[in-house]
Amino acid sequence: MAGGSSMEANEPRQLFIAGRKSALIRLTCAAGMRPALLEVLNTYADSLGDEPGTEMFMVHLDPDDENNVWLYETFLDDSAALAHRSTEGFAKMMNDMPPLLEGPPAILRMEPLRMSVQESVLTEDWSL
């Protein structure tokens, strides 16, 4: 089941992921522009095969504010984060977003340390 979840919990997989880089980004779109912003983000996400060091790119909708869209990104290291910002797809996304936003993105840079994930997340069929 695509994107579905099972309530059966197993022993989670514990991963030490020090050395990676991540970012939590808040995008506040102009009123009524969320569908257009999501289209830009989805188009960009479709190009992530060109970024082998981008390990995770997640788009989140804010349940409390329909004008906020959150991104969570994880990169193998600093070089991968730099390469991410140097791609053609990233440049296009950054060119397409400003007219859709109320202001500049709010970026919180982080250094992940540990991840706990249920094995079922890794084996489910999440294809679109």
Regions found by a protein language model. Give the residues of each.
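Glycine-rich beta-strand-turn "strand-cap" elements at beta-sheet edges
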Residues: 2-21, 59-67, 95-128
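An amphipathic, aromatic/His-enriched active-site/gating alpha helix that lines ligand/cofactor pockets
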Residues: 2-6, 16, 43-55, 74-109
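Short, well-ordered beta-strand segments in beta-rich or mixed alpha/beta enzyme
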Residues: 20-28, 58-85, 127
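A general structural signal for well-ordered alpha-helical segments in protein cores
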Residues: 22, 34, 90-93
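Short, surface-exposed ligand-recognition loops at beta-strand->loop->(often short) alpha-helix junctions
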Residues: 28-38
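Residue-level signal for secondary-structure boundary sites
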Residues: 33-35, 79, 115
